[in-house]
């Protein structure tokens, strides 16, 4: 959805409908069930239309699940893929070391979530024939594992957990993530916002990239000011950047809410 702001500049917002289990036709049998979601997007667009530009600099922020997810995938997940570790990623010399506060546990789920439900992208066996199982990557802030193929698992003396997949049948299997997430904590969103005097609550992203040093840059499509512990005005598009393991070592609150996002695509050379 697009609208013109009072200054004549266009503002845009979008969201992904569907995703998760099933195929496209499973999610779009009745368009009416998305009317409420579309109304919400229009309301957000009108807020963004009146939004303000962010101030540059270091800020305390709250990251919604969409931002936490892209951080887990792009800025952390790729650095602990063992082929990239062999290529010199930041994780190469950090195994067994603290890379985050003890609030952070990050897992790459194979096919079944802790509550017994099916993961958004269930993988039961990978393209090397390895039975898939969960891989704990960060445990209470300590980097404890890599995602492996059979070859890299032998190199590192680890067990493969089914992370080798090819984009198509003719592609060589590469080490890939499956259902990667930072596990929820115990804090409430309202308490997290109340703890910030001057910062931002970022809710939606429109792009992101990172390199093997963990340095990242994410586009922010929707968010709000936080002033004196309360949400303020909506903001216009902006960009955040940082270094993942440095950021994770500043986390002091973690929401008890968890939302899966199925909107991303990841090529990794294929």
For each of these PLM feature ranges, what is it?
Residues 1-270:
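N-terminal small-residue-enriched
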């Amino acid at each position: 959805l697009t609208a013109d702001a009072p200054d004549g500049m266009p503002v845009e917002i979008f969201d992904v409908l569907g995703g998760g289990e099933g195929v496209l036709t499973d999610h779009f049998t009745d368009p009416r069930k998305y009317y409420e979601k579309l109304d919400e997007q229009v309301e957000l667009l009108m807020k963004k239309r009146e939004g303000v530009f962010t101030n540059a600099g270091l800020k305390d922020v709250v990251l919604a699940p969409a931002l936490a997810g892209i951080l887990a995938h792009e800025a952390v997940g790729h650095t602990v893929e063992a082929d990239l570790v062999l290529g010199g990623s930041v994780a190469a010399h950090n195994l067994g070391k603290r890379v985050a506060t003890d609030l952070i546990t990050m897992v790459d789920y194979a096919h079944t979530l802790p509550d017994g439900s099916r993961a958004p992208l269930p993988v039961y066996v990978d393209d090397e024939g390895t039975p898939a199982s969960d891989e704990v990557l960060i445990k209470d802030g300590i980097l404890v594992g890599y995602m492996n193929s059979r070859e890299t698992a032998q190199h590192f003396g680890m067990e493969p957990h089914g992370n080798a997949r090819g984009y198509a049948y003719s592609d060589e299997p590469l080490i890939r993530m499956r259902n990667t997430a930072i596990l929820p904590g115990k804090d409430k969103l309202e308490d997290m916002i109340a703890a910030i005097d001057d910062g931002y609550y970022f809710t939606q992203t429109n792009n992101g990239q990172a390199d093997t040093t963990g340095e990242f840059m994410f586009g922010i499509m929707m968010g709000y000011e936080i002033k004196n512990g309360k949400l303020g005005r909506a903001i216009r598009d902006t960009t955040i950047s940082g270094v993942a393991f440095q950021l994770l070592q500043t986390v002091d609150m973690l929401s008890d809410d968890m939302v899966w996002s199925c909107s991303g695509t990841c090529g990794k050379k294929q």
